[in-house]
Swiss-Prot record:
This is Adenylosuccinate synthetase. Homodimer. InterPro entries: Adenylosuccin_syn_GTP-bd, Adenylosuccin_syn_Lys_AS, Adenylosuccinate_synth_dom1, Adenylosuccinate_synth_dom2, Adenylosuccinate_synth_dom3, Adenylosuccinate_synthetase, P-loop_NTPase. It comes from Pelobacter propionicus (strain DSM 2379 / NBRC 103807 / OttBd1). The gene is purA. Mg(2+) binds at D13, G40. It is found in: Cytoplasm.
């Protein structure tokens, strides 16, 4: 028996959705434990592309229980739209296979309004927020001013808490951000309508997950964003507002750490980042444009073009250490086909001195200079490779070198967007 956590090993957008989709076959429950609809998973099933922002990727498999845990912040409108779309396509036929934690926090209209207004006033200090209200919702959770799902489903409690909190939120919007206030009656009616839909999905998910663990079922924990966006261990302040690392599994789902047997970090064969913040290997030349175009590097949530750069072994070693990774799933190796040579960042220098790890201060991180080694590329189309041995010699050498630099075994190699374009070297569930 194995329970597996999936986390991003870079700055998000590493291809977690595809890997989760593959591993779902071996799991009974798929659990999201942090984040909100600021992340998007893009899955290609046959010739169909499916983009999910809240509902776990496992929903595309019949007979699997998908759980959105207490560590997630939920936009009811987005969740309901995803449900409707899945039902219309015949992919959600049993509501009992999708559960929401009664303790998760609800994103309110004022969270989104505040998020957008703050970013607009930030000038050249923009974080790069998606404007979905994620950060302000987590602020209220920590400040004990949040509205949980269980509160939303009790109209009297919801009305009282909304009225209390809206006084402060409207003061902030009007007096400090120069925005129009939110309307109490409008929010009350709109969200009371959402509550009736959400009621069918609410449960004590921590209890359910632990009961399933006791029964010997296999759990797959699905992370969002990436290690370098973690609120504590990421490139602060250019981070998200939740714990994206493996430690967030426990607090975001209600399970103890002894139940997590494998932690798989997802990494592209190069690096991308959306929004502001340090990125030592970022490319501003034709190679960067080529990676962006070949990899389709545009955000599934925002549509923004992603910043692209060469593989950064410093980042991956940091992710291995911070998460305790037991394996790495390497995605988008096929995007590198056609490059005459490929660079790998093996270390950084700062003011002429070699660094042992990533600097904590963003100002120092911004000034880091990457140290590169160069490997020969390959011209063959590898998207049809079914085994590691079928890859060109230089592609195999590249993967092996990344594994050496990471200090962690590569357990999966993705050579295309489809499920069947995957080489599994070791299955963490078996």
């Amino acid at each position: 028996m194995a329970n597996v956590a999936i986390v991003g090993a870079q700055w998000g957008d590493e291809g977690k959705g595809k890997v989760v989709d593959i591993y779902t076959e071996y799991a009974d429950d798929i659990v999201r434990f942090q984040g909100g609809n600021n992340a998007g998973h893009t899955l290609v099933v046959g010739n169909e592309k499916v983009v999910l922002h809240l509902i776990p990727s496992g929903i595309l498999h019949e007979g699997k229980r998908c759980i959105i845990g207490n560590g997630v912040v939920l936009d009811p409108e987005v969740f309901i739209k995803e449900i409707v779309k899945l039902k219309e396509s015949g992919r959600l036929t049993d509501d009992s296979c999708l559960l929401l934690s009664e303790s998760l926090h609800i994103i309110m209209p004022y969270h989104k309004r505040i998020d957008i207004a703050r970013e607009a006033r930030s000038g050249d200090r923009k974080i790069g927020t998606t404007g979905r209200g994620i950060g302000p919702c987590y602020e209220d959770k920590i400040g004990r001013r949040g509205i949980r799902l269980m509160d939303l489903l009790n109209r009297d409690v919801f009305a009282r808490r909304l009225k209390e909190f809206l006084v402060e939120k409207n003061f902030l919007l009007e007096k400090m951000l120069g925005e129009a206030p939110c309307d109490y009656d409008q929010i009350l009616e709109e969200y009371s309508g959402y509550a009736e839909v959400l009621r069918a999905y609410m449960a004590d998910t921590a209890l359910i997950i632990n009961n399933d663990l006791q029964a010997g079922k296999k759990i797959l924990f699905e992370g969002a964003q990436g290690t370098l966006l973690d609120v504590d261990f990421g490139t602060y302040p250019f981070v998200t507002s939740s714990s994206t690392c493996a430690g967030g599994v426990c607090t975001g789902s209600g399970v103890g750490p002894r139940h997590i047997h494998e932690i798989i970090g997802i990494s592209k064969a190069y690096v991308t980042r959306v929004g502001s913040g340090p990125f030592p290997t970022e490319l501003f030349d034709a190679d960067g444009d080529r990676l962006r175009d070949a990899g389709g590097e545009f955000g599934s949530t925002t549509g923004r073009p992603r910043r692209c750069g060469w593989f950064d072994a410093m980042v991956i070693r940091y992710a291995v250490r911070t998460n305790g990774l037991t394996g790495i799933a390497l995605t988008k190796l096929d995007v590198l086909s056609g490059f005459d040579s490929i660079k790998i960042c093996t270390g950084y220098t700062l003011d002429g001195k070699a660094l042992e790890t990533l600097p904590s201060a963003p100002e120092a991180f911004e000034n880091c200079q990457p140290v590169y080694e160069e490997l020969p590329g390959w011209n063959a189309d590898i998207s049809g490779a079914k085994s590691f041995e079928e890859l060109p010699d230089s592609a195999r050498a590249y993967v092996k070198r990344l594994e050496e630099l990471a200090g962690c075994p590569i357990v999966l190699v993705s050579v295309g967007a489809r499920r069947d374009q995957t080489i599994i070297l070791r299955n963490p569930f078996l």
